């Protein structure tokens, strides 16, 4: 009996907060690569931000829940939020690989800049063996260097990296946090449900 293998995109991040840039990128990539769904995974205790203040994981997870309402192709996961200690991508992918083995192929969505950090990830060679990557290239980013990096990682480590071009969206979580702190509007930068949650919980005021 032939099994219809699904294609699942994975978008991990601190999401502090999640914003419309994340959602637009995910939707464009979902359509371009015919992904059956995109799984949003808020980080629990990210090791690369251990010297930074990160909003409580429950708040960040709740904002992701609010942001994904209304899109049947977007799902959220508590897999990292519920894990104690630092959360590493290899551990998350190991669990997802077991869960979806033979059922779905995993596509990990990253920004082009992350291509240059992949070799600092814990057990990165195992990561390359578990999933394919979709690297999002924004306008104005050096395409030649981007493709050279992809070729190097594929040739040297047998990584599988697909290229996605997305529009330039000048929104960042840092910008949103700063605007809230300064009493400025964040309307149209985040979904209205996320804006309301931030106001209700009094986030980013300090």
Curated annotation (Swiss-Prot):
GO terms for biological process: NAD biosynthetic process. Keywords: ATP-binding, NAD, Nucleotide-binding, Nucleotidyltransferase, Pyridine nucleotide biosynthesis, Transferase. Pfam families: CTP_transf_like. Pathway: Cofactor biosynthesis; NAD(+) biosynthesis; deamido-NAD(+) from nicotinate D-ribonucleotide: step 1/1. It catalyses: nicotinate beta-D-ribonucleotide + ATP + H(+) = deamido-NAD(+) + diphosphate. One of its GO terms (molecular function) is nicotinate-nucleotide adenylyltransferase activity. InterPro entries: Cyt_trans-like (IPR004821), NadD/NMNAT (IPR005248), Rossmann-like_a/b/a_fold (IPR014729). Its EC number is 2.7.7.18. Belongs to the NadD family. Catalyzes the reversible adenylation of nicotinate mononucleotide (NaMN) to nicotinic acid adenine dinucleotide (NaAD). This is Probable nicotinate-nucleotide adenylyltransferase.
